[in-house]
């Protein structure tokens, strides 16, 4: 059974009982991330690193050994948050909570540690072999959703990271690493009452609070006449996305189930498009479909990498593909296959505490708290007619946007009016 509990301090606990597996999965997420970097791009990611550089009682090596001594632990920074994750023996839950709390509250963030960690992070930036894809993804997501947090890269630059001081780190941690800005998600065989007490004793009571208000999903005004966007870069390929943006939001559980089902079926079908897109030995690796649902809107994206001379032929294939499925609908066989995958994932994921906990954490991005079972049953209850109806609504009533990041020029891409004429929907 899944539960949501808010402590008086503002700390949020998401809990789901799982007796099939004896281990416990924990995620501690702080609402900040690179959107809070300000002028010091990469500050959030740098702060995540600094939690492992030593406390007033433990050295850098001792902190790392203590944190990574559990079954499987990690920490990461995204546009939206900084997160600690752990798959641990259930009997060590209190120890894990205390370990993270100690790293947050008692790290020294000394000037010497900051200078030492700069070398590590700068090397990470220099060795980033996928930087074009990262830049393309960040630009694309900002254009798709017009959300401020997608403007900023997580790693930052060598120049901005080298400007970070011990004071910058301390101020950032003091502002954002407070209990009223944290959501803890736990999937465990331990009882809810037991978990609630452990979190209160070993984390909630020892963490500071402040008057920080929840960060909004800030957005800019959409520009309706700029539905084809080109970001010209001196690279030998293009990242092409065809996006269908809906105003429907993610709080509706049934709509989430519909979009997920549509996205998964389209992703299966799009694998067959890869052969059609291998035009003149162009740079096409595969055609993928992604769906996104959040508090602001939802979107379906068809994505590939391609050479500039084949962007128009590629768009022709995609448009023809969308026209066909809107006209004919998904088949019963395609729908049944997706339902079968849903059953399979439920049977396997319910045995994996990390998977169950991942479903809990989606609370941060939606207006509604749901459990893994809620999602499974919502998909299970769909009909083919409902899925086809939602699919047609998505493709016929959404805003179409084409985004190209790479070496293409305007003449290599259709205008939005040309694209709209090609759609028979």
Per-range role (PLM):
Residues 10, 28, 45, 84, ...:
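Buried hydrophobic packing residues in well-ordered domains
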Residues 16-21, 25-29, 210-272, 378:
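His/Glu-based metal-binding/catalytic segments typifying zinc-dependent metallopeptidases
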Residues 146, 150-155, 159, 178-179, ...:
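An aromatic/glycine/proline-enriched structural segment found at the starts
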Residues 183-189, 333-425:
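C-terminal regions of mature proteins
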């Amino acid at each position: 059974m899944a539960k949501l509990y808010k402590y008086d301090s503002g700390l949020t606990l998401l809990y789901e009982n799982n007796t099939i597996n004896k281990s416990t999965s924990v995620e501690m997420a702080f609402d900040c991330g690179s959107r809070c970097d300000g002028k010091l791009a990469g500050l959030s990611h740098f702060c995540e690193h600094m939690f492992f550089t030593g406390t007033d009682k433990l050295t850098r090596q001792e902190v790392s050994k203590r944190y990574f001594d559990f079954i499987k632990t990690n920490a990461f920074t995204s546009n939206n948050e900084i997160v600690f994750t752990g798959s641990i023996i259930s009997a060590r839950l209190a120890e894990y909570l205390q370990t993270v709390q100690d790293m947050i509250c008692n790290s020294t963030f000394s000037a010497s540690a900051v200078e030492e960690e700069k070398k590590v992070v700068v090397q990470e930036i220099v060795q980033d072999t996928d930087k074009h894809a990262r830049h393309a993804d960040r630009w694309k997501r900002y254009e798709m959703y017009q959300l401020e947090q997608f403007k900023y890269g997580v790693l930052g630059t060598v120049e901005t990271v080298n400007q970070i001081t011990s004071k910058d780190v301390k101020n950032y941690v003091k502002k954002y690493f407070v209990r009223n800005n944290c959501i803890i998600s736990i999937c465990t065989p331990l009882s809810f009452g037991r978990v609630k007490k452990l979190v209160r004793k070993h984390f909630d009571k020892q963490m500071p609070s402040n008057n920080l208000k929840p960060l909004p999903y800030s957005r800019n005004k959409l520009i309706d006449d700029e539905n084809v966007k080109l970001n010209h870069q001196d690279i030998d390929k293009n990242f092409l996305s065809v996006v269908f943006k809906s105003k429907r939001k993610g709080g509706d559980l049934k709509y989430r189930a519909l979009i997920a089902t549509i996205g998964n079926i389209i992703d299966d079908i799009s694998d067959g498009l890869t052969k059609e897109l291998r035009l003149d030995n162009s740079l096409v690796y595969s055609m993928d479909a992604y769906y996104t649902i959040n508090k602001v809107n939802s979107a379906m994206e068809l994505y590939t990498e391609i050479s500039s001379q084949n962007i128009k032929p590629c768009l022709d294939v995609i448009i023809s593909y969308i026209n066909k499925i809107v006209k004919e609908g998904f088949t019963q066989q395609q729908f049944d296959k997706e339902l079968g995958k849903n059953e399979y994932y439920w049977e396997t994921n319910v045995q994996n505490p990390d998977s169950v906990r991942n479903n809990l954490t989606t609370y941060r991005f939606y207006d509604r708290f749901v459990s893994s079972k809620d999602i499974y049953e919502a998909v299970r209850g769909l009909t083919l007619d409902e899925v086809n109806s939602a699919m047609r609504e998505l493709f016929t009533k959404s805003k179409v946007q084409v985004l190209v990041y790479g070496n293409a020029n305007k003449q290599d891409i259709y205008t939005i009016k040309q694209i709209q004429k090609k759609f028979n929907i």
